[in-house]
Regions:
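Short alpha-helical hairpin
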Residues: 2-19, 221
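Short, charged/polar, low-complexity loop and linker segments
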Residues: 216-236
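Glycine- and acidic-residue-rich phosphate-binding/metal-coordinating active-site segment common to enzymes
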Residues: 76, 84-110, 116
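Amphipathic, well-packed alpha-helical segments that form the structural scaffold of globular domains
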Residues: 14, 18, 37-41, 84
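His-Asp-centered metal-binding catalytic motifs of divalent-metal-dependent phosphohydrolases/nucleases
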Residues: 36, 52-70, 75, 79, ...
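Generic structural signal for well-ordered, non-transmembrane alpha-helical segments
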Residues: 34, 232, 236-239, 243
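Alpha-helical transmembrane segments and their immediate juxtamembrane boundary regions
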Residues: 240-252
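Divalent metal-dependent phosphate-bond-processing catalytic cores, especially two-metal-ion Mg2+/Mn2+ enzymes
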Residues: 4, 21-51, 63, 92, ...
């Protein structure tokens, strides 16, 4: 029976996100949800969860970003509302509905997981940080924020934002992810630092070229002014000599 419900959940969410999610959500789309579901299963299987716990997690993973179909603001709460309505209509146990709701809410940016299940979903939702495709996903998120939130970042600002998230705001929680994903996350962090270093170097080169061009421009202006001055002096001298010649002629 539970397998049938999981299939219904998958079908419902696939249909909802395919039809109602705005195309501006380039990162938080059906593909992201499917990846989170797969990563949730991967962690669950490696940690040996009970069937019920694994099912609760999978349901929460499917529903965790459905709220984006209504609004970006407080989308986790909206996701809970959508999940609760669906699960109640399918006679899902009340205590399990509450667990699913709590799991969805832990995917909020600054939420701290309190249970093992919450740690698993929190880690699965951030699996992209350790992905070989991190920079592709990161680029999609940047464009999504620009389209949905109107937030535009310079390369310098975007790199700084990512460094802050990697080093200060994010951590993996489960034993499985700490053991298996930390190294790949560090690799991506190292690449971000390299990008920052390259950006600084490129900016320095650009500034030096700009200064060199300005210097060259200033040097080219000076001779022109010098020539103008020379012609003015020559003209003045010519006029003076002419005046002298005229004066002498008059005297004679």
């Amino acid at each position: 029976m539970m397998k049938a419900l999981l299939l219904e959940v998958e079908k419902f969410v696939n249909n909802l996100l395919s039809k109602k999610l705005h195309s501006n959500y380039l990162y938080h789309n059906l593909g992201h949800t499917q990846r989170v579901v797969e990563k949730t299963k991967e962690i669950s299987e490696n940690l040996g969860l009970t069937l019920i716990d694994a099912e609760n997690l999978e349901i929460a993973a499917w529903f965790h970003d459905t709220g984006f179909t209504e609004s970006d603001e407080n989308h986790e709460e909206k996701s809970v509302k959508i999940a609760v309505e669906f699960l109640k209509s399918h006679k899902f146990a009340e205590d399990r509905i509450q667990i699913v709701a709590d799991l969805i809410l832990v995917t909020k940016m600054n939420a701290v997981p309190k249970t093992n299940l919450e740690e698993i979903l929190k880690d699965a939702d951030a699996a992209h940080l350790a992905s070989k495709d991190f920079f592709k996903f990161n680029s999609l998120l940047r464009k999504e924020w620009e389209l949905v939130l109107g937030k535009k970042y310079t390369n310098k600002e975007w790199i700084a934002l990512n460094l802050s998230f990697f080093t200060q705001k994010h951590r993996y929680y489960t034993d499985f992810t700490l053991k298996n994903w930390s190294k790949d996350k560090e690799k991506n962090l190292s690449k971000i630092l390299k990008n920052q270093k390259k950006l600084k170097k490129d900016n320095k080169k650009f500034k030096q070229k700009e200064e060199a061009l300005n210097l060259k421009k200033n040097k080219s202006i000076v001779p022109e002014r010098g020539v103008e001055t020379m012609f003015r002096v020559a003209l003045r001298n010519h006029i003076t000599l002419s005046d002298i010649a005229d004066t002498k002629a008059n005297i004679l």
